């Protein structure tokens, strides 16, 4: 495969964070930018401008972020001297992102920063705000000319870089996604839009492509002839925490399935691009979404299960039900669990079921893909109980990131009994581990480089919503069941029914080499 396209870091840049006083900024964005600063991966002349309704002076804002760095960086990563250097380029502007009257003030503040760091107007806008502001901010930026890139030079580079990063969810359904795309098209070009999905910033997610397309031993087997089924799990062992107001309007399907899990399905199922560049890679993602087999209402009822966690005794204490959480209605029908069986109608995957699930308050926190290969056509060897050993490839996204190949080996001694063994690759042992803030650091760096490969394109957003919309519509009917499951369990028992009769979900634990356990290690 030809080499990746080359992208260049500008010499100067201002990163403008809408929602600069919010949770995402202090937990993820600032720690990730600090990591890039330590690695000399930021532009030579770089500033951050935080925006928000909270009143901060520049000094108070830096102190607030310094506390966040000490709290959210991994042990040993915080350096007081480096943090001071990094934060010296951070500024704050109190303003209301929803108010058009405040944007001339933003424009003037950016001019001041441009003069301070000799910046020709290169800006990246990061929308770390409630989704209700996603349609407002681009229009207000355009009203004061902060969307315009200017004339291109002989290398095709604009005189002023203007990019905008939008957090998920991008739309609430297909119609709202289309409307949002139309709003952005009026103010920005597609190449300026970076719809971020932090799952794609994880090294282990990107390693799916390396595993498939950089190794000749896997790709010949990566099809309906050798793979029996694919299973993708992304679950958490905590509830909604302080996100009650947001989560009750969103639910697990919008929060996780339509974006994160759909992307994992696409990376697992996509065809190899001719070369690894943004458009060719994203074209293949869209083709997978186009191949999702639509489900009739009857098929949705058989193949999709939704659930909501109920109270239980777990971890030695009482766990309250979802409906007892803060800012949640006592009769809420918002799902905290989704399990689904879907098919991809194309040459490679025809007839192979993809089982996906996500949930809150599960026994452990884990995201992994399990490729189940078909058994041998004739059983020559068997285990002690007479069964055959299935071949599986486990791709652990998080935690204990790595890849494990499960296969049969002969038990030493007389006879020909076999047992399941594994060959394991872990990032900790062979790559020196992964830095904290890894996913956001990678995606922020890509955005500054102008590489949109790992960001979602508008047509992919709409194609994904096109598949999931009928499910959401059917859920509006009162008779569609919402099953309860005790907090700390693997979801409603009804989710087992969507797996083929002879199969069951793989319930992993956090230790890659002991995937049949589901304890928290």
Predicted ranges, named:
Residues 1-166, 170-521:
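Secretory/organelle targeting and membrane-embedding segments
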